[in-house]
Regions:
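Nucleic-acid nuclease catalytic cores
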Residues: 221-252
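Extended alpha-helical interface modules used as scaffolds for assembling large macromolecular complexes
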Residues: 3-229
């Protein structure tokens, strides 16, 4: 990093490869495939784990480290979760979220084959259209899941998995935020061009709406987004524009 800093450039990879080995602890902790899937569902779909405060200190027992009920505490002491409040733990940052999503994809046998995605991202370099990236995500990524999984999914899973996919190819061009706090609420997904790149001053704000199968028929009759959803995401974009007036902010 010193060499990169002195040269005035940004490294292609900012994630320490040693961090990837942390995911092996989930394999060791959970012991079985079913337990591992349940743990990952809680983190990447529900976005949290419940825990007992006493287990962090007064009742902590290293002999329970591999007990199913003790998983949240074990992950916390491994630095793989952080405390949200006195009841819930969450993932600490986007880097760890990406690591968990990568393992989730492995467990569910979701292909990461570059052939599925690279042509779309190459076109994005040329035309800067976000819509094909979303279409590619739905067809090539979500399209690999069996139908019964979709009723378990939610907006949190959509924004996390979309972030993981987009950041694979555009992390040298953009910084990313999930549930970005602003003066009018929390935007689902935002990508902001990095200064010094061709993407500087480019900002995209995305709001996801997930509907389960029983609501799909009603939603498929719509020819355009609902008015209240458009107003919502435009307010997020306006807030970003106030903070970064030199950026070209687009909302979706």
């Amino acid at each position: 990093y010193k060499r990169q800093a002195n040269a005035g450039s940004i490294p292609d990879e900012l994630v320490d490869e040693n961090l990837r080995t942390d995911i092996n602890w989930i394999r060791r902790l959970t012991l079985s495939l079913d337990n591992a899937k349940a743990m990952l569902d809680a983190l990447v779909i529900d976005d949290e784990l419940s825990y007992n405060v006493a287990d962090l200190s007064s009742k902590f027992n290293k002999k329970k480290f591999f007990d199913k009920e003790f998983y949240p505490i074990s992950l916390f002491y491994l630095g793989m979760t952080t405390l949200k409040n006195s009841y819930r733990m969450v993932l600490p940052n986007l880097t760890m979220r990406s690591v968990y999503m990568d393992y989730y994809n492995q467990l569910n046998r979701i292909e990461g084959n570059a052939q599925r995605y690279v042509p779309t991202y190459e076109r994005y370099d040329a035309d800067r259209r976000l819509e094909p990236l979303v279409q590619n995500y739905f067809e090539q990524y979500l399209g690999q899941f069996p139908a019964q999984v979709f009723d378990k999914m939610n907006e949190n899973f959509i924004r996390c998995s979309f972030y993981e996919l987009v950041s694979r190819y555009l992390s040298s061009c953009y910084t990313f935020a999930i549930e970005q706090n602003n003066s009018v609420g929390r935007s689902d997904f935002e990508m902001t061009g990095i200064p010094g790149t061709d993407y500087y001053t480019d900002d995209r704000v995305v709001e996801f709406k997930y509907y389960r199968a029983k609501e799909a028929e009603k939603m498929l009759t719509l020819t355009e987004p609902l008015a209240e959803h458009i107003v919502q995401v435009k307010k997020y974009g306006e807030d970003t524009k106030r903070k970064f007036p030199n950026y070209h902010v687009r909302t979706y």
